[in-house]
Amino acid sequence: PRSIPTPSTPAPPSTADQTFDAIARLVEGLRGLKATGPYTRALMTQAELRAYQKKKFEENYTPEEARRDTLTLAAFDLLPRDFPLRDFLLDLYTEQIAGFYDPDTKQFFVISDRTAPGILERVTFAHEYTHLLQDQHFDLVALGFTDDERKRPKDLSDDAMLARRALVEGDATLTQLLYLSRLPPAERRQWWEAVQSQPSPVFDRAPRVIREELTFPYDQGFAFVQHLFEEGGWEAVNAAFRDPPASTEQIMHPEKYRLHEAPIRVSLPPLTDTLGSGWHMADENVLGEFFLKVYLEERLATDQAERAAAGWGGDRYAVYVNEGAGQDLLVLWLAWDNADEAAEFVEAYRAYAAKRYGHGPAREAPGQATWVGTDVLRLEWQDAHVLLLRGPNEALLQRVRARIPFPR
């Protein structure tokens, strides 16, 4: 393991500003980065946070976008179609966020209903100050962390963006833990007890997919950054900001990042004309290894889901909906590292489908299986490719299938 730089610990400060200044100097020493410009910081109450988040939601996450996200997650059996996603996320972020840095405004806030920073606020400041250092040295906006779509990298998939978030949060979490390690044992215990005693009723009742997506950048991101740090110190972590991970697969398997195992590009044809009147596309993107695992975990044990998702090479999904008829279509095209990995996924997905429908396939042929219930699921595989189609009836799936030829 790499040795950690040990900056001198400042004398106990007497005001909130002095406290934060002292933490900033300590974090700069621990992280090996110095602030290069001015910034704004402030304490914000829970009530102010909710007002701020509500304004951000209204500006950047419309009811239409939330509805599309809900329908997409519903197509993967991860949310009910009528789940109030937008309102729930506002409640969740208000409850969960202890502080945040805004790369667009270069401001960061620590959430507290007190004027003097306690142990939670001090540790949160260390985490958020790391984000400021990241932004000043590596430009978080250029990496995609912005509400301005014009400034985001083009063609950056949701999976790649989640991988970048894991890098950013993993780095800040490692730095936060290094800061904690410099505190007296009594203060570390005080912090842990404060964290454990924080009520989280909204998080506790959140659908599993939301909990998993919220924690992935911190848990898996920390493991990824820790791996980089142990291999090459802060130089390796800094290099990852200049050459960010391309997929959640690279986060979950750091050796694939080191080998630059890039995702296989997969494309799908437009299907609106094929589907006919009343249908529109809700979403098209890359699912990625992480969300593929989350999807499988709805009906499979975690270890089986992890094994089935490992070996992911690339994918593309599309969700189309006919809201008037209450119908949806899921298309998921998966490319695997090799035929054996594809076969392992097929075996696991057959078990998933059997649990979803309560029975085995209605029809089978070499390289394909079809389940029939209140909707129809068609699974096809050939070499290292797997195609999954689920929709309201077989006739529609047949038309869609005719538009998606297997690679030769």
Language-model regions, residue ranges each:
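Short pre-active-site segment immediately N-terminal to the catalytic Zn-binding motif
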Residues: 108-126, 160-164
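Active-site recognition of the HExxH zinc-binding catalytic motif
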Residues: 27, 123-140, 169-173, 225, ...
